[in-house]
């Protein structure tokens, strides 16, 4: 027997397992299934609080033009049915006044709702000295930190507005106005912990090109009495962190949109975005006065970095003490090798589930939360709502904002990944003569291949699975000359392909090691992902993306009824399962842990 003839199939049984659930005709992850939130034209940051009368109060920034145009202002709307329908818009600040933007709500225990926002109080019409004539006309990210309140659950708002004193820092003194005009905006929705309220925001230094907010640092406001003090003139405020510097990135000049949560021991954890190809995180153990040094966010302490573009990367804590991170799962060092558009590729939205351990957050491998069939859609600025055991998320694409109910099992799966030892149901384990189960059309359907493999060498052109016809129609999994696994899809008309990560990092191939491998073909967002040894490939050091899109026009990729399984493999293959559905990341990790 030559090495080309050898294949190990230990543990193979030909059993069709019961399907996990009946097919779902509506994919909740598709953003078009959500419920629209009213707006004027442009719409941003649809943030929700549940008021003491049981209704949802959503506040948002809107305007008849595009982002940053005159007439941009802040409004409220109310829902009595968990976001399915909404009231007419209620002005908090009018469209005919100075720009009012980036509104964030806080509900006090006694029922008052405050909103905090950037207000162009002095009605400046141009940013002097800006290097872009177009951006010089944009005056929605400067002025004063203002707030108003409502004592009737958002139906009416105080006539008076109040202002938070803002301590100048180095980044302010170095702006175009030497700190006499402040540039800032906030997206870090207020949180409450131990009788204090916090919210996050970014101070802006240089304004203009490239990127509009050329320099920024993360900061926080804290009030120790806003939850009980009913005279808004007596509310105290502390700008954090102490000193002259805010939260910064390890390399680049951008540290935007700090977003805080509280840990069980009173520590604070914050995420913020950069232009470095990763998001950042920081911990404070003293109520926000000081923070850990600049560091890219990692899935676990000293673990691999979380790739992310210049987009919202929000963290949320739920009543069960667990966390959720919204991000976009691409970036890395490879972005610096060529031209990169940091504001692009906000579709799909990914989440990681977080658990607290030893005063740190450990993040799960990512899952797709939301997608749009148009890759250019840019969904962002979410808010998460929890009510009566159900979970919801809001998001905006700048011209449409929606509410979505989240499948609770998606979140539970992410939170429980580390302990999951269950084999995902619905798989067929192939055994001789390797009759290939029929796969669904990729037009809305999907499939997963799941197997264990050990290579004696990583030479190219090894074949793990192949059911292609002479015309090429079918699927194949092979090994490339980069020591990566390669999936080929062909429906007789169109061909798509994607391969696993190269290199030596987590989720890559080694000689002599048993690997658990899954490749997921998801016909909802039309995305292929590789998961190797419980690590969802993120592109590693070489690629910006570890996940790839396949042609959305692909349909029937069934090839020959009998597959060739390991006809040219220098190694062993075990437990090759074929699923006629996409598996969630958490299901694949359950298979990995199950052994």
Which residue ranges define each predicted feature?
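Twin-arginine (Tat) signal peptide motif
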Residues: 1-5, 153
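N-terminal export signals
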Residues: 5-21
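Short, intrinsically disordered, charge-balanced linker/junction segments flanking boundaries
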Residues: 16-21, 196, 465, 549-553
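Asp-box/BNR beta-propeller blade signature and adjacent active/binding-site loops
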Residues: 22-422
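Extracellular glycan-associated modules
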Residues: 420-595
């Amino acid at each position: 027997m030559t090495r080309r003839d050898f294949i190990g199939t230990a543990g193979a049984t030909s059993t069709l397992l019961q399907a996990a659930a009946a097919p779902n005709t509506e994919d909740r992850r598709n953003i078009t299934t959500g419920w629209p939130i009213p707006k004027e034209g442009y719409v941003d940051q649809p943030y929700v609080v549940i008021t003491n009368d049981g209704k949802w109060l959503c506040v948002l920034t809107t305007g008849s033009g595009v982002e940053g145009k005159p007439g941009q202002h802040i409004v409220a709307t109310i829902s009595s049915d968990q976001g399915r329908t909404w009231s007419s818009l209620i002005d908090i600040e009018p469209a005919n006044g100075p720009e009012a933007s980036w509104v964030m709500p806080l509900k006090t225990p006694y029922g008052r709702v405050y909103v905090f926002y950037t207000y162009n109080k002095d009605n400046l019409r141009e940013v002097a000295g800006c290097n872009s004539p177009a951006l010089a006309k944009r005056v929605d990210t400067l002025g004063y930190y203002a707030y108003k309140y409502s004592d009737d659950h958002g139906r009416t708002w105080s006539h008076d507005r109040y202002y938070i004193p803002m301590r100048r820092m180095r980044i302010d003194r170095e702006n175009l106005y030497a700190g006499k005009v402040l540039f800032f905006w906030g997206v870090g929705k207020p949180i409450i912990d131990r009788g204090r309220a916090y919210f996050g925001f970014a101070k802006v230094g240089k304004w203009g090109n490239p990127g509009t907010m050329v320099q920024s640092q993360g900061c926080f406001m804290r009030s120790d009495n806003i939850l009980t003090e009913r005279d808004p003139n007596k509310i105290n405020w502390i700008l954090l962190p102490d000193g002259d510097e805010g939260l910064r990135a390890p390399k680049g000049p951008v540290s935007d949109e700090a977003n805080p949560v509280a840990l069980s021991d009173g520590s604070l954890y914050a995420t913020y975005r950069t232009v470095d190809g990763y998001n950042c995180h920081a911990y404070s153990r003293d109520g926000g006065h000081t923070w850990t040094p600049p560091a890219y966010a990692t899935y676990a302490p000293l673990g691999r970095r979380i790739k992310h573009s210049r987009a919202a990367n929000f963290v949320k804590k739920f009543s069960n003490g667990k966390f959720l991170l919204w991000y976009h799962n691409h970036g890395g060092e490879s972005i610096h090798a060529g031209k990169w558009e940091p504001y692009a590729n906000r579709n799909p939205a990914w989440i990681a589930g977080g658990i607290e351990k030893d005063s740190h957050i450990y993040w799960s491998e990512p899952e797709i939360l939301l997608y749009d069939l148009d890759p250019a859609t840019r969904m962002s600025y979410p808010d998460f709502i929890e009510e009566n055991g159900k979970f919801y998320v809001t998001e905006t694409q700048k011209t449409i904002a929606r509410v979505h109910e989240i499948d609770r099992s998606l979140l539970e799966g992410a939170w429980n990944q580390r302990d999951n030892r269950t084999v995902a149901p619905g798989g067929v384990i192939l055994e001789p003569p390797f009759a290939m189960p029929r796969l669904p059309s990729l037009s809305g359907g999907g499939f997963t291949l799941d197997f264990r493999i050990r290579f004696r060498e990583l030479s190219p052109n090894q074949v793990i699975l192949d059911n292609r016809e002479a015309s090429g129609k079918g699927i194949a999994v092979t090994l490339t000359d980069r020591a990566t696994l390669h999936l080929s899809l062909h429906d007789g008309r169109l061909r798509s392909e994607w391969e696993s990560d190269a290199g030596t990092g987590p989720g890559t191939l080694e000689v002599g090691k048993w690997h658990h491998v899954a490749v997921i073909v998801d016909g909802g967002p039309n995305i292929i992902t590789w998961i190797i040894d419980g690590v969802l490939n993120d592109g590693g050091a070489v690629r910006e993306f570890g996940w790839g899109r396949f042609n959305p026009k692909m349909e029937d990729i069934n090839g020959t009824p009998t597959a060739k399984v390991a006809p040219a493999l220098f190694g062993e293959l075990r437990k090759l399962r074929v699923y006629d559905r996409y598996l969630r990341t958490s299901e694949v990790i359950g298979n990995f842990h199950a052994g």
